[in-house]
Amino acid sequence: MRLEKLKIAGFKSFVDPTTLPLPGNLVGVVGPNGCGKSNVIDAVRWVMGESSARHLRGETMADVIFNGSSTRKPASQASVELVFDNSSGRAGGEYARYQQIAIRRQVARDGQSSYFLNGTRCRRKDITDLFLGTGLGARSYAIIEQGTISRLIEAKPEEMREIIEEAAGISKYKERRHETEQRMRHTRENLERLADLREELGRQLGHLQRQARKAEKFIALRDEERRLKLELLGLRWRALERQLDRLKAELTDSEERFRRLTGEEHACETQLEGLNRLRGVAQEKLDVQQGRFYELGAEISRLDQFIRHTQKSRAELVQERERVEAELRKVESDRDDDRLRLEAVRAEAAELKGKLASLEQEVAEAVSVRQAAEAKLKTCREGWEALAGDRHRLEGQAALQRSRLQQLREHGQQLGGRRQRLLQQQSELEKALAALDVQAHRLEVAGIEAEREETVGAVEALAREAERQRDRLRFARERLNPARAGLHAVQGKVASLETLQRHAMGRDRSAAAAVLEAWQLSAADRLGEKIEVAPGWENAVETVLGAHLEAVCVDSLAPYLANLQAQEPAEFLALCEYRQGPVAEGTGGPRLLDYIRAPLALEGLLAGIYCASDPAEAAERARSLQPHESVVTPGGFRIGKGWVLAQKPDAGHAGALARERELRECRRRVEELEAQCRILEREASEAEVELERLESEGREARKKADELSAGLSLARSELAAAEARSEQWRHRLDQLSHELNELADQELELAEKRAEAEEALQTAERDSLRLQDVAAQRKGEWLALEEAFAAAEAAEKSLHEEVRALRSRAAMLESNAALTAAHLQRLEQQHGQTADRLAAIVQRLAESQTPLEDERSRLDALTEERGVLEAEMARQRRRLSELEADVRRVAGERQRAEHELAALRESIGQMKLAWQTAEVRRQGIEEQFAELGAAPAAVVAGLPEDAEESAWQASVIRLGEEIERLGPVNLTAMQEYQEQEARQRYLEEQDRDLTESLATLEQAIEKIDRECRARFKETFEKINAGFQRMFPKLFGGGKAALELTENNLLSAGVSVMAQPPGKRNSSIHLLSGGEKALTAAALVFAIFELNPAPFCLLDEVDAPLDDANVGRFSQLVKEMSEKVQFLFITHNKATMEIAQYLAGVTMREPGVSRIVTVDIDAAVELASV
């Protein structure tokens, strides 16, 4: 598998379609820096599947597209193609039979890449699979870029292992292992889902089994809870009695102490008022004195500041006067010096003017002499140079014509040989084209494509339908589980409510049950079960009816009256007759019957009972009632003519009507949920059956589609290869015909050029001999004129220097005179200004003396007055401090009394509140005892003295939690249990199948691991041996080796040890850049020696090497080229010498790279002719 050519278009700087042929095993790429040589390496890496823009020296994948230049627009897409010669059949699998393999990658501005294999669109994975085990890849050891040769040897042990694995061909095994692990992961996920389903199913089965046992505990726990609650009430009542006695004694003591503290507080307030009045008077007197003190202080401060400021100003004026007098004396001295200096400068300037005029006349004469000599020299030089130029031109023309004749002779020989080769190729291609049948391949591809498209369409339709069925199944299961959970919860609630309601309706009374059983009325409805009460009036109805809620509903009372008279009295037995006629309307306002709906004759029980919204309205309406009538409120308060009844329903019937309404609602909800579950179960079952059918058909269709895809890929590859060969051969025939015609024209043109060159050579040789004699004569004349011109130029230069010196001196004198005059004028002005300033200073000193004495006298008087006032203020402050101390002491005593009163008042309030709270709680407990029909004293008498409420409370809570933990009871669990058990058996079969599949996959993993271990060990040992042999060869000595970081061959990293001759370094990182590069080269060549990749790309690997190492490196590359094809980029001439074929990358147009190729062997052969 050999790389034939590289085609680039629009990739980075290669904007034009460019082909780089690779005819030999040593191809060098040369060119200046920045011309695009490394873009060739990037192109190869990119087309082989590189997906990281960073490894291509870019930020995004679109950066590889030519981005435009000063003269070019940006390209719309980039394309790179590699063409391989696979005549050796090294490409594995289905590609082994192709003589030529072409892979191409192109990318547009949107960053999406497309891959093509022999002209057929494919995936990136297909490209990487093609190179698995060959040593090639986007980041393989066969591509070594700038700077990476050293990083290769410094790679981490894990990264170095990947290189050894690629050399061992393990990558394809690892890919298979990865795919097997994915299948194992999917299998484990399915097992986990099955385990979750089985676990959930197991929980449901256990739940159904447990529900039957829960009902047995309910009654026993309820009775025990009632007993403990009654005893707990007794404990609380006894504790409240003791608390009330204690609070009453504490409250009496606190009230006595409160009266005593109130008297103390009043005495403190009276004393505090007298002290505050005295403190106010003292404070006012001190404020007046302090105000006067501040006024005196301010005036004294002002006078003191004024005196200091005046004294400072006078001192500054004296200093200023002395400084001005000194300045005036200096100005007068400087003025006299400048007058003398100005007279001397003017005299010297007049003398220089005479000398300068004489020298300027001499300079004019010297310039004339020099110009005449220069003109003669120029004329002579131009004549001699013209003759010399003509002679050299004629000699160059003669040499050019000789070279041209030699090239024309060689070119003629080449054209003759080329004609013979082209005629032979033309004959061979015509025969091959006649034998190639492309149409048969096209018909085969069309047939497979049509069948595959039909199969793919069927697969997609089946997949869509299967997904729809999965959604349907998932949706049904998602709805079924909550529905089942809701059904179980409601069924449990129904069972609990039925148990409670059975007790409330008296169905568990044994004596009455025997009578009803004898009368065949055990299953008859009870009054509380047949009536419906308007919301809010349940308490009122329960209060009025009481035990009559347990009445048995019968069609007629007549058959049972005689039996009742003869029967033994039961604990309670009531009968109620169904309504036989219409209900009479009431006349005294809303009746309780108006809030009840029932098919029963309730007029006898509820006649004359009216309704009111609250007790006040009931009392108002009771005034107009008849003796047998009464009014009841929603809360159960009942009032009649001359009587009032305030009671709650008895504990057995409390909430029975609301519970009955809730029970009817729950039964209706159970029916709805059961219907919903049946519908959802049917939908889920239908979806599962349909999904299994669709998945089976989909697998068969996908299998057929895969087979057709493989066949289509093979057929397309064969068609593409045939079409490519046909197109290539036809194109080559056209090229050959065109080249033969061009050869005939070139041979005619070559003969004409040869005759022209011979004639031009003879003419140039004759003219050159004639001009040689004339040029010698002109040379002597030119030398004599040069000497005369040099003498005139030196004389002129000397005079010019003297004139410049005199002019410079004159200019300097004029400048000095002007400066001195200006300075003298400034000194005169400064003298007058300084004298005026001195007079003003003397006058100001005289004027400031008198005010200073007056202010000093006034300052002494004010200071004495402030001292007297300060002593008086100190006495007043001491008096005020004594009064404030007394105020603070009395205020502290009052505050202490207030705090004690506040705390005591709050304590008394809390004790009263606690007493009231305890009293209310005791009354509440006594009411609860009354409702339960027990006396507190009797219950407490049966309790031990050390009984603690917390223990009884914990027992009640424990029993409540046990009852709560029982949850609802499900009476329909058997059928569901059988259904779920059958489903569990099906899931267990699925689990066994998946477990067996997982075991098979694990065996496959073990087999792959064994193969990988064996291959890795063998490859590591061979590469290590080759590395140990290559290293001394490159370094001229030393030693190197590869070492494993651990014993596990599946995970062990690989480290590199290298010691050049004479060194004992402990780490590879201590080597120089050149030594690292040579060590990495030795390792790469050892890998290539074991498993040579089809080609190797080296990008300036020799850059860090010196000349001796470059020589050894080049010789080793040349030896390795017998097995491996090398494409190297270099700037080193020694490396270029080993190349069989040179490709030069140029950038004549800014930003655009082009390739110029040279066959070195052909060039050497041509040069030797």
Swiss-Prot record:
- Record keyword Phosphoprotein present: no
- The residues the record assigns to binding ATP are P32, N33, G34, C35, G36, K37, S38, N39
Q: Which UniProt keywords apply?
A: ATP-binding, Coiled coil, Cytoplasm, DNA-binding, Nucleotide-binding
| Matches recorded under SUPFAM superfamilies | P-loop containing nucleoside triphosphate hydrolases, Smc hinge domain, Tropomyosin
Classify the source by domain of life. Bacteria
Where found?
Answer: Cytoplasm
Q: One GO biological process from the UniProt record?
A: chromosome segregation
Query: Gene Ontology terms, cellular component aspect?
Result: chromosome; cytoplasm
Kindly list the GO molecular function terms attached to this UniProt entry: ATP binding; ATP hydrolysis activity; DNA binding
Per UniProt, residues of the SMC hinge domain are: 525-620
InterPro entries in the record? P-loop_NTPase, RecF/RecN/SMC_N, SMC, SMC_hinge, SMC_hinge_sf, SMC_prok
| Coiled-coil regions, chain positions | 170-265, 307-481, 656-914, 985-1014
Q: Which family does it belong to?
A: Belongs to the SMC family.
HAMAP family, from UniProt? Smc_prok
PANTHER family, from UniProt?
Answer: STRUCTURAL MAINTENANCE OF CHROMOSOMES PROTEIN 3
Report what the protein is called: Chromosome partition protein Smc
